[in-house]
Regions:
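S-adenosyl-L-methionine
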Residues: 1-80, 96-154
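Class I S-adenosyl-L-methionine
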Residues: 3-4, 20, 148-160, 164-212
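Surface-exposed acidic, glycine-flexible loop patches that form ligand/cofactor-binding
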Residues: 38-47, 92-97, 149-152
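Structural motif
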Residues: 52, 102, 156-158
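Short loop/turn segments at strand-loop or loop-helix junctions that form parts
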Residues: 53-61, 108, 188-193
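A short acidic (Asp/Glu
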Residues: 63-69, 113-118, 142-145, 168-173, ...
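Short mixed-charge
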Residues: 79-102
């Protein structure tokens, strides 16, 4: 049985309720980004950094209790960490870092996509470093990979794939990311209990969709 997505946003309607485990996932993503950005800029010789951050299943950006979603958390974390890094560089008499960070936020639901644009704009984060795309993550993957390759030889990038379904980012897609972008980082999450139920289906198409 197909699972109904309860995380839909629509301008003028009630916001979705975020569950506790989703809040924990957001905290993990935030902590990971801070640690990773510090890792990439450690050492006194580092003076610039190009990085692409792709949120493949981003939702509308805010929940009913005021909790912000991954697009806002990502932006806030990066901006905060950039300031801390350069403050520490300055106090250590090291050269500050020039950051060139691009964000790609993908949401397949049209209403949620429109809500996301509104949320980003309300927070002042809908600017030239941000690209919002309406559609399926896999449909944009080739374009995203090409853009990353054209931007930098280092190809530094993070894919945040907090998928609601279980075949939205199948194994061959993850493999393709690592093959095309060897320095990519991928944060992949899904519900294990629900995944077991999903795999219990007798339809061979289920395993095929996941690349198994």
């Amino acid at each position: 049985m197909a699972k109904v997505n309860k995380y839909n946003w629509c301008i003028g309607e009630d916001l979705p309720i975020i569950e506790d485990h989703s809040k924990v996932k957001l905290d993990i993503i935030e902590n990971y980004l801070e640690i990773y950005l510090r890792y990439l800029t450690k050492g006194f010789k580092v003076s610039s950094l190009k990085l692409d951050i792709i949120d493949g299943f981003c939702g509308g950006g805010i929940y009913s209790d005021g909790t912000t979603g991954s697009p806002i958390r990502i932006k806030e974390t990066i901006e905060k960490t950039k300031k801390i890094i350069n403050f520490e560089k300055e106090t250590s008499n090291c050269k500050t870092v020039t950051f060139d960070i691009k964000y790609t936020f993908i949401e397949k639901n049209k209403n949620s996509f429109l809500f996301l644009n509104k949320t980003l704009n309300d927070y002042g984060y809908l600017n030239e470093d941000t690209n919002c795309l309406n559609g399926k993550f896999v449909s944009y993957l080739d374009l995203i990979i090409d853009n990353i390759k054209n931007r930098s030889r280092a190809n530094r990038c993070i894919f945040i794939l907090d998928q609601y379904g279980y075949a939205d980012a199948p194994i061959p897609v993850i493999k393709k990311i690592f093959e095309q972008l060897p320095k990519a980082e991928v944060i992949l999450t899904f519900s294990v209990d629900s995944l077991i139920d999903y795999l219990s289906s007798e339809k061979p198409q289920v395993l095929y969709n996941m690349g198994l």
